[in-house]
Amino acid sequence: MAGVTIEVKVDDEDVKRAFANLQSTMKNTMPVMQAIGTGLVGNIQRRLGNGVSSNVWPPLNPAYKATKRNKNILVESGALRGSISEQAGNDFVRVGTNKIYAAIHQFGGTITAKNAPALFFRLGSGFVRTKSVTIPARPFLTIEDEDERLIADIIFRFLQNKQ
């Protein structure tokens, strides 16, 4: 995943105990990790599609907003949402995207012209020429309360099925 990924350190003692229990109970925890990854991908895609998140994102530039086909901030063609994927191993789950532009949305930053004196792009009904554009951070690869519940539910379900 060349775009952006999230890593989460688990601090919740119940979840840590459940993972330790899981690893001692199961020799192969890959199915659990894959289920967690699949659940996280689904939640992130749904939040992107609905434009619903606990994160309050900065509003769009009004001129740009007027030209958007989709009312949700990080959705235009659906390519970003469709690119969210997971990788899982026996002791990890990685969720991310291979879209290079995802990083600027996740972390924010300033875009400057690389091979020209200025950036030149269409905005609204006209064109803009500027030295730089600052994109505010709009984190979409996040772990929210519903994700924490999902992770715990999956782990506990797998543990119950092993007993």
PLM features: residue spans?
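Short, Lys/Arg-rich flexible segments
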Residues: M1-Q163
